Amino acid sequence: RSAAAQLRWADTASPSRVLLVCGSARNDGNCPGEMSKTFRLLEIARETLEQAGIQTDVLDLSLLSSEYGRKIHPCKGCASTAMPLCNWPCSCYPNHALDQTNDWMAEIYERWTAAHAVIIVSPVYWYQSPSPLKLMIDRLVCADGGNPDPSATSGKNPGKAKALEMAGWDYPQHLAGRAYGLIVHGDVAGIEDARRALSDWLDWMGFIDAGVQARLDRYIGYYEPYATSHDSLDRDEAVQEEARNVARAVAKAVVELRAGRLQAVQPNLSRPRPK
């Protein structure tokens, strides 16, 4: 499925697609009782992209907290044994003996692969990304150097994986060449560090940032009560427009990317240390 998604991504006749990731754990289908500000900002970005003729795909990670059986299992850290032991896409699940089944990542890998760009919208939880978002990030390690051929290591054979890496591994970047934008918001502290962590991660994986206006971090209702935070977002028309600008910047980047012009201004340099 990921291979088919890669073909759709590369097909110049296919529609331009942007994956919108809602990183919040909060929604109106469980204990919080109301939608997140993150989802509202994502909807602003989605509407802007669709007005620009971009096909959108909304990946709402808050469903992990509100849908029965919805799971992203944790990364097992195969890459730290040897990079070729980590498969693209991940082959660690399902593990029926441990009841590690129904892994959402099997679908999520395909959705990332098919997208020409991604916009991640996320709140700050304790200076960091929320756990649903971090689970997905960790499981995407296989996109940066992962082995697309599990048979090369006879499945999960550490010795064979180590031998492959020592013989020379090129650490293929399976999602490189896609554009990205970020919207990170908080109420008291941590927005810049959280946004930089996401930027650094995507840069490392070979994504291309869509420009300074595509990387947004803002406080909404700074030191105001949580109970009125949606009112604060209602009043903050500037941050709503900035969210639209993130989407506009990404939409323009996708056009340039698919025409080959965005890559043309990127330095095509070999990495002396590709890990």
Predicted regions and their residues:
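N-terminal beta1-alpha1-beta2 submodule of the flavodoxin-like/Rossmannoid cofactor-binding fold
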Residues: 1-152, 230-275
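Short loop/turn segments at strand-loop or loop-helix junctions that form parts
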Residues: 20-24, 218-223
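Short helix/strand-capping connector loops at secondary-structure junctions
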Residues: 219-233
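Short, glycine-/small-residue-rich phosphate/pyrophosphate-handling segment
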Residues: 131-132, 148-215
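N-proximal short alpha-helices
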Residues: 106-109, 167, 223
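Surface-exposed beta-strand edges and their flanking turn/coil or helix-capping segments
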Residues: 71-72, 195, 222-225, 261
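Short beta-strand elements in bilobed, periplasmic/extracellular small-molecule ligand-binding domains
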Residues: 53-60, 208-217
